[in-house]
Amino acid sequence: MAERSNSEEVKLLGMWASPFSRRIEIALTLKGVSYEFLEQDITNKSSLLLQLNPVHKMIPVLVHNGKPISESLVILEYIDETWRDNPILPQDPYERTMARFWSKFVDEQIYVTAMKVVGKTGKERDAVVEATRDLLMFLEKELVGKDFLGGKSLGFVDIVATLVAFWLMRTEEIVGVKVVPVEKFPEIHRWVKNLLGNDVIKKCIPPEDEHLKYIRARMEKLNIKSA
Amino acid sequence: MANEVILLDFWPSMFGMRTRIALREKGVEFEYREEDLRNKSPLLLQMNPIHKKIPVLIHNGKPVNESIIQVQYIDEVWSHKNPILPSDPYLRAQARFWADFIDKKLYDAQRKVWATKGEEQEAGKKDFIEILKTLESELGDKPYFSGDDFGYVDIALIGFYTWFPAYEKFANFSIESEVPKLIAWVKKCLQRESVAKSLPDPEKVTEFVSELRKKFVPE
C-alpha cells in the first residue's frame, strides 16, 4: 500500500485495549494511512486530550493536519470520506444507511446492554445475559449467507463489531458466563473465524494473551468472580 | 420509479420532527401516518422489529430507522436540493459530532427536567442548562450551526424547542435568560417553512407533557 504524502499529519490519541480506539486503527491501516499513535492513560488524561476533546474528554481522538475529530463512528466516516481507497461504507445510499444503523445498534444496544453485567450476580446477571443474547440474535440473522457484515469483504459494520468479536467474547471467557455460545450463534462464530483470517484485523486487535490479562485485572478490580 | 414515502411518526416526538423537516427541505411529498404508541400498528412492528420505535421512514417499501440516520438518507437520496450536510469532510464530521452529542446528552438531560422532582430535578435542570450552553457556545455568532446555511445540527436540535415551555413550567426557570443566543437561533429557524410546518404548537406539547408527567411524578 502506498504511503501518503509526507505533508499529511495523522495522529491518533487512543488506548491499546479500547475497542473504540482499535477500530480507528483498523480503518487507517485498511486505507494504508500512516499515523502516529499516542497512548493515553485514561486515569490521568493528558492536557492534549482535554484540549482536543473538551466536550467528552474521551479517546479516541483523530488529529488530521491539526484538526481534532471525536467519537469513533464519526471518525470512521471521516476516514472513509477523506481517504477513498478501499471504501468501508457501501456506495448505495440504502445499504450505507443500514451500515449506519447496525453500527449504532452495536454501540448503543449491544454494548450498553452487555456492560450492565458488571457487578451483577444470580438472576440479575442471567437477565442481562438473556437481553444481550436477544440483541446478538439480530446480528446472527444479519450474518446468514455472508462472510462479513460488509458482504464478501471487511466493511464498516465488521470494524465496529470487532467490539463483539474480541471484547465481548473475550470478556465472557474471563468472567465465565456464556453470552455467545456456538450452538446458539454459529454464524457469529463463523464470522469471527473470517475476521481472524484478515491480515488487517490480526494486526490491529490487541494481542490475545495481554488483552485477557488486562480484562482479568479489570474484572477483579470490579469484583467480578472469575470462573 | 414511483417515489412512495411514508413516515410513521408521533406528533410530539422531537425525533420525528427531524425527519419531517428533512423531507420538507428536499421538497419530498410524503404520507404522514400517526402512530398510537400504546397500540402500535402491525406496520410499525414489521418495519422496526428491533426498536419498535418511531419515526420510521418507509421509502418504496423499505424501512429506514433512527431519525438521525433517516436525515442522512434523505440528504443522500434527494441530493439535488438544499444540502443538509456540508460537503467538506471535516465540517461533516463536526456536524455528526454535535448531532450525536444532542442524542447522547440532551435527550436524557431534558427528561430529568420534566419527569422528576425535588433534588433530582434541580440537578437535572443544572445539567440541561449546561448542555444548552455548550450548544450555544458551538453556535457562536453563526446564524446556523454549520455556518450560513440551515443544516444537519439545526435539524437535530430545533424540535426540542417545542418542549421548552414544558421544561420551563415544570422546573420553574427561563431558558431564554440562560441561553439568549440559542433562542434567537430558534426564532430564525422557525421562519423557515420546513420547520414551521413540521413543529407542533408548543402549548399542545406542554399539555401532552403535563399528562405524561403524571405517570412519573404522582401528585
From Swiss-Prot, chain A:
Judged by the first EC level, this protein's enzyme class is transferase
Q: Coiled coil: which residue ranges?
A: none
Q: Which GO terms describe its biological process?
A: glutathione metabolic process; response to salicylic acid; toxin catabolic process
Question: Superkingdom of the source?
Answer: Eukaryota
GO MF terms held by the record: glutathione transferase activity
InterPro entries, per database record: Glutathione-S-Trfase_C-like, Glutathione-S-Trfase_C_sf, Glutathione_S-Trfase_N, GST_C, GST_C_Tau, Omega/Tau-like, Thioredoxin-like_sf
Which Gene3D superfamilies does the UniProt entry name for this protein?
1.20.1050.10, Glutaredoxin
Domain GST C-terminal residue range list: 92-215
What PANTHER family has UniProt attached to this entry? GLUTATHIONE S-TRANSFERASE U7, GLUTATHIONE S-TRANSFERASE, GST, SUPERFAMILY, GST DOMAIN CONTAINING
What family does the entry list?
Belongs to the GST superfamily. Tau family.
Q: Which named protein is this? A: Glutathione S-transferase U7
What's the name of its gene? GSTU7
UniProtKB/Swiss-Prot annotation, chain B:
Q: Catalysed reaction per UniProt?
A: RX + glutathione = an S-substituted glutathione + a halide anion + H(+)
List the Gene3D superfamilies: 1.20.1050.10, Glutaredoxin
Q: Specify the enzyme's EC class, one word.
A: transferase
Write down the superkingdom of origin. Answer: Eukaryota
Q: Which GO terms describe its biological process?
A: cellular response to water deprivation; glutathione metabolic process; response to oxidative stress; toxin catabolic process
> Which positions bind glutathione?
S13, M14, N39, K40, K53, I54, E66, S67
One GO location term (cellular component):
plasma membrane
The subcellular location is: Cytoplasm, Cytosol
Q: Name one Pfam family in it.
A: GST_C_2
Listed GO molecular functions? glutathione binding; glutathione transferase activity; peroxidase activity
Q: Please report what switches on or represses expression of this protein.
A: By dehydration stress, salicylic acid, ethylene, methyl jasmonate, auxin, H(2)O(2), copper, benoxacor, isothiocyanates and the pathogen Hyaloperonospora parasitica.
Keyword Manganese found: no
- Chain's role: Catalyzes the glutathionylation of 12-oxophytodienoate (OPDA). In vitro, possesses glutathione S-transferase activity toward 1-chloro-2,4-dinitrobenzene (CDNB) and benzyl isothiocyanate (BITC), and glutathione peroxidase activity toward cumene hydroperoxide.
PANTHER family, per this entry?
Answer: GLUTATHIONE S-TRANSFERASE U19, GLUTATHIONE S-TRANSFERASE, GST, SUPERFAMILY, GST DOMAIN CONTAINING
Q: What is this protein called?
A: Glutathione S-transferase U19
